[in-house]
Regions:
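S-adenosyl-L-methionine
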Residues: 1-188
Length: 188
């Protein structure tokens, strides 16, 4: 029943938005279109996935497939990272460099009581990192630092290959990726 209703709502929204002008700001249709898009985004941000790992329940806001996949593979994608966090002393300070959506920041803060500095330069991931921190009531444990870390003090370009929530593998000050190949910058 839930999938059926979701399908009906999606089709109504698609039909409505296809008739709405895309640029005439004075149009009632345009304003209605913006309103509908805002309501749709609000609904997307209400999707929460809970993952239980070693008795610690973590909540993740999952508005798209990629963020949902990251939450679902939390325990299997980087088992060595989880082992490392488990080996830390309780209350240790942790720097999560490239925190993305905060998967490991959340776990360290919840499981070890760590004070976490979550470095994440992607504007597309910062919103979910903040929402995930809030959903898990860890604002007092996780400090979000919206900058890239480098071995130099400078201003440079952030080469983003992905503009989705949960996107990764971007570079700071370099136009090649982890594999040494030139990256196709999607957003600079």
């Amino acid at each position: 029943m839930r999938k059926f209703l979701k399908s009906i709502i999606q089709n109504i929204v698609k039909a409505f938005l296809s008739f709405a002008p895309q640029k005439d700001m004075t149009s009632h249709f345009y304003r209605a279109r913006l309103f509908m898009l805002g309501q749709f985004q609000k609904l997307m941000m209400q999707r929460i996935r809970s993952e239980d790992y070693k008795g610690h329940v973590l909540k993740f806001v999952v508005p798209n497939y990629l963020s949902d996949w990251r939450a679902q593979t939390f325990a299997s994608k980087e088992p060595e990272t989880l082992e490392w966090i488990d080996s830390m002393q309780d209350g240790a300070i942790m720097w999560d460099v490239g925190a993305n959506l905060g998967l490991y920041s959340l776990y360290a803060a919840k499981a070890k009581g760590s004070q976490v500095f979550a470095f994440e330069p992607s504007v597309f991931n910062l919103e979910l990192l903040a929402r995930n921190t809030y959903e898990n009531k860890l604002q007092d444990k996780i400090c979000i630092v919206p900058i890239a870390l480098s071995n130099q003090t400078n201003f440079n370009d952030m080469h983003m290959i992905n503009t989705q929530w949960g996107g990764a593998l971007s570079t700071f000050g370099e136009d090649f990726g982890w594999d040494g190949k030139k990256i196709n910058t999607n957003f600079l």
